[in-house]
């Protein structure tokens, strides 16, 4: 690749898969507005394991393979190497119905954060947008329904997200939230978690 591409300056890691159901719903147990839960079955547990494996492959193993493949090339061929990880706000602010999605995206975020310490010669940017317009949810590994407001009507515009990604990478920004005020939402979770959890339930129309 270093011969064919003449090296690499910037790596963008943006691939991923969605998951849209509460964790126990994947196992076949309805949890919303229930005071007593059914017991999970062997089939339901196995389905959860299979769905979790698919989410992990897309959201964690994929970025891991990208890092192992391209970090040496970046380090050896670029005078100013950089990596942009397009992650999700759900990786730092927990969301109902996004249990598997959020946890696997959080895993890849911490992976790259640790990697940035191991490779200080590479400029890392961790991009965490809120809901973005488009059909990304069609990739859901659990075939769950979209509960929040129509992403194409209320989500961030793809062109705006792409421009912000480019600017953040060019400027060497580390942790980038979009919209920017969501940075305070992340901090607020540690100060007033009940408020953030109520807002998350409203956004995802869960138990409200």
Model feature map: region roles:
Residues 72-76, 113, 117-118:
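Alpha-helical segment proximal to the catalytic Tyr-Lys
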Residues 88:
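Residue(s) in the substrate-gating loop at a strand-loop-helix junction
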Residues 67, 104:
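Active-site helix of classical SDR
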């Amino acid at each position: 690749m270093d011969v064919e591409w003449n090296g690499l300056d910037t790596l963008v890691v943006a691939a991923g898969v969605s998951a849209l159901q509460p964790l126990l719903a994947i196992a076949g147990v309805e949890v919303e507005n229930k005071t007593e839960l059914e017991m999970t079955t062997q089939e339901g547990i196995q389905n959860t394991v299979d769905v979790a494996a698919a989410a992990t492959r897309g959201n964690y193993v994929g970025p891991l393979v990208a890092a192992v493949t391209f970090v040496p090339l970046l380090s050896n061929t670029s005078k100013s190497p950089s990596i942009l990880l397009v992650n999700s706000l759900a990786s730092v602010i927990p969301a109902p119905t996004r249990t598997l999605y959020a946890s696997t995206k959080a895993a890849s975020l911490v992976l790259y954060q640790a990697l940035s310490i191991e490779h200080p010669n590479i400029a890392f940017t961790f991009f965490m947008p809120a809901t973005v317009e488009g059909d990304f949810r069609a990739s859901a590994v659990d075939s769950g329904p979209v509960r929040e407001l129509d992403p194409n009507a209320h989500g961030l515009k793809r062109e705006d997200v792409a421009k912000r990604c480019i600017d953040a990478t060019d400027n060497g920004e580390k942790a980038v939230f979009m919209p920017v005020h969501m940075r305070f939402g992340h901090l607020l979770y540690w100060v007033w978690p009940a408020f953030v959890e109520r807002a998350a339930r409203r956004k995802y129309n869960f138990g409200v």
